[in-house]
Amino acid sequence: MQRPRIPTLLSAFLTLLNDRLSESIVFPLLPFLLARFAPDGRTLGLLAGSYALAQFVVTPLIGALSDRYGRRPVIAICVGGSVAGLGLFALTVSLPWAESSILPLLLLFIARIIDGISGGTAATASAVLADISPPDKRARTFGLIGVAFGLGFILGPFVGGQLARIAVPLPVWVATGFAVLNLLVVLNLLPETLPVQSRRDLPRKRDLNPFARIGQVLTDPSVGRLCAAFFLFFLAFNGFTAILVLYFKQRFGWGPELATFAFLVVGVVATVVQGVLIGPLVKRIGEWRLTLIGLVLVIVGCLMIPGVGSPERAPAIFIAVAILALGTGLVTPSLRSLVSRRLGREGQGTALGSLQALQSLGSFLGPPIAGISYDLLGPVSPFAGAAAVLLTVIVLVSGSPLSESTQNQA
């Protein structure tokens, strides 16, 4: 089993990297890619939300299929789907279309949904790493997940911004090329890591229903408030970040290079916080206080962005974005840890899976709400609305049953 370990690690790592890289290339450029078809906030929000909706619905099924039929075929099909979705998106934004045609918008939504359905590769590639790692080395192997995601978040905006200077659709074609390379590596190097004797039957339909999972944790008095806070945090955060580039484009006249640089700042700061700082900070301050500090930082960053009133002060945006990334890097792992600590070991899988479902649901609902608000109430409204929701999150976390005990332990 030692000989295939390196190609297996390479295949899993490339799959995880491609999952983050392709999305962080495409997402910041959506307002520029949509400019010919529908440059409004509502369409942008719906397009961003459609990707998350597909992931929300399909991810539990993809995980179950990989447990039943093996990791390799599921990863290959998902990466192939990513090639199809990205390729369709790239082709659609590259072709000339009549101004009155709704076909390109329809194709863009189909492409994003296909790519979202294929997003289950991250969970299955993580399962590959678990399959090939003994328990005492699993944490070190799982560090590859953070490295891959961090590289993807950093390289994606940089690559997208630089290539968009040549032609706005070009980054999507390059993302498609990365996905093709990923597929070739999977087909040629990735062995099956789940033995036949370890495979499971497909679960009941109810167990694949993401809403059923969510209902279980939200009605649990011990973690319900924290899980509601987790959902509201991602609802607010994914809402205003979905229209962030559109705001930069319309308010300051930024092009793709400057707009994607803001997301590059997010990637660098978030990677440093979650990869280097979060461990020592948790030991020193505790998860509960870190969550509240992070929420305050996100609110400050969120309100700073519309506070920059003129293009001459636009560099202050990067400070606000860095504060946002710092706060998010503190909140996400700390809030997950609070839920995890409150539950017994036997409830970990269900709870953490439910948190992922809540995150996906917030990522689906947030962008359309923010986009509609942007169009109807003005460009500042998504930021003000997000700040109000985040204040509610602070109230929920402060009043959770964990507050007192966690404070004492910290």
PLM segments and residue spans:
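Hydrophobic core of transmembrane alpha-helices in multi-pass small-molecule transporters
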Residues: 17, 85, 99-120, 315-330
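Cytoplasmic membrane-interface "Motif A"-like loop-to-helix N-cap segments
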Residues: 68-79, 283-295
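C-terminal transmembrane helical hairpin of 12-TM major facilitator-type secondary transporters
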Residues: 288-335
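C-terminal ends and interior cores of transmembrane alpha-helices
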Residues: 80-101, 297-311
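Juxtamembrane intracellular "pre-TM" segments in multi-pass secondary transporters
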Residues: 1-5, 191-228
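Short amphipathic helix-loop junctions that connect adjacent transmembrane helices
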Residues: 28-42, 242-259
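Helix-to-loop junctions at the C-terminal end of transmembrane segments
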Residues: 59-70, 273-287, 374
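Cytoplasmic helix-loop-helix junction between adjacent transmembrane helices
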Residues: 109-150
